A protein has these predicted regions:
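General small-molecule cofactor/ligand-binding pocket signal
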Residues: 9-11, 151-153, 244
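Glycine-rich, basic loop-to-helix element that forms the pyrophosphate-binding segment
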Residues: 10-30, 40
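Membrane-interface aromatic/basic loop that binds lipid-linked glycans or pyrophosphate carriers
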Residues: 221-292
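Short aromatic/hydrophobic "clamp" motif used to bind/position activated sugar donors
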Residues: 35
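Nucleotide-sugar donor-binding loop of glycosyltransferases
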Residues: 14, 67, 154
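Acidic donor-binding segment of Leloir-type glycosyltransferases
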Residues: 1-12
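Donor-binding/catalytic cores of nucleotide-activated saccharide
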Residues: 40-151, 161-174
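Catalytic core of nucleotide-sugar-dependent glycosyltransferases
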Residues: 156-164, 170-197, 210-242
Length: 292
């Protein structure tokens, strides 16, 4: 029992089922109007919840996202983090998806440091994938695609503790590689019904870019066997979504075109290209091009 039992409820899952299962339990069992997610090793500012809550009361959007700063275990500021410009997005269906994939503005991928309307998450059946260690990517993708409104806040409301041994900091294992592949497959399935949208080019570009990035990282991993690398690369380098029903000439089309051309090659050539890039150690250049 927590000392503040009337205000704090502890849900015991009996054994460690991972962060994805824990977050799904939170969504299912939340009794309030809003849900805030944070990791146990991070620190929120003293006014974090008040800032996000006041914005929610002012604008009544599907979610509020605060800015954050990275720090070390000792509390020293570490390079990175993200600071939004104060922005209100409130234009109806796919408003947030248009902002992210049509206009190309960033909405940070982490589930944490966001205040969600619980009913929004439940109405759209937004959940993490049980068993996945990289649960943020799919959860936030659903949020962006389903949200009709959101507010981005310039105030720094969370300090993210950089952990060199965290899931996102270590090299690609077999399990992590399979989860990245699975997440991209889910994204490809999701966008099938959006072929006529003007932001579809951005959706294609996002999937293609990240597929090539993960192909490189898997190809460069010493923890994935050659046989499994072949299977994973074949999956990642197969286009699983349709072409748009209308080709909108915008910046994302021109960004996607080199990837679409690459994906038109025979699989053996695509895999050879990835292996060649790995062999000449272009890791630093790839990391400079692609951020996630």
């Amino acid at each position: 029992m927590h000392p503040r039992g009337k205000n704090v409820r502890i849900i015991d899952q009996k054994y460690n089922q991972g962060t994805a299962a824990a977050r799904n339990v939170m969504v299912a069992n939340a009794t309030g109007e809003y849900l805030f997610i944070m990791d146990s090793d991070d620190v929120i500012s003293p006014d974090c919840i008040d800032i996000l809550y006041q914005k929610m009361k002012q604008y009544s959007v599907d979610f509020i996202a605060g800015s954050f700063q990275r720090q070390t275990w000792d509390g020293d500021i570490y390079p990175g983090g993200y600071r939004y410009k104060d922005t209100l997005i409130k234009d109806g269906d796919y408003a947030v998806a248009e902002y992210r994939y049509g206009q190309g503005h960033e909405i940070f991928v982490a589930t944490w440091n966001k205040l969600y309307k619980v009913q929004f998450l439940r109405n759209n059946n937004i959940r993490c994938i049980d068993g996945y260690m990289i649960d943020d990517v799919w959860f936030t993708y659903q949020v962006i695609m389903c949200a009709r409104s959101c507010c981005l806040v310039s105030d720094c409301t969370l300090f993210y503790t950089y952990n060199p041994n965290s899931v996102t900091s270590v090299r690609y294992s077999q399990k992590l590689s399979e989860q990245y592949v699975g997440t991209l497959s889910l994204k490809s399935e999701w966008i099938h019904g959006l072929r006529n949208k003007s932001f579809y080019n951005g959706l294609m570009y996002d999937i293609l870019k990240m597929s090539v990035y993960h192909s490189y990282c898997i190809g460069n991993s010493e923890f994935v066997s050659p046989v499994d690398k072949q299977k994973l690369l074949s999956n990642l380098l197969s286009r699983k979504f349709p072409y748009p029903s209308h080709w909108y000439f915008n910046k994302f089309l021109f960004k996607a075109l080199p990837f679409l051309l690459f994906y038109s090659f025979p699989m053996s050539i695509k895999i050879w290209v990835i292996r060649f890039i790995v062999s000449i150690n272009l890791k630093d250049k790839v990391k400079r091009w692609f951020h996630f």
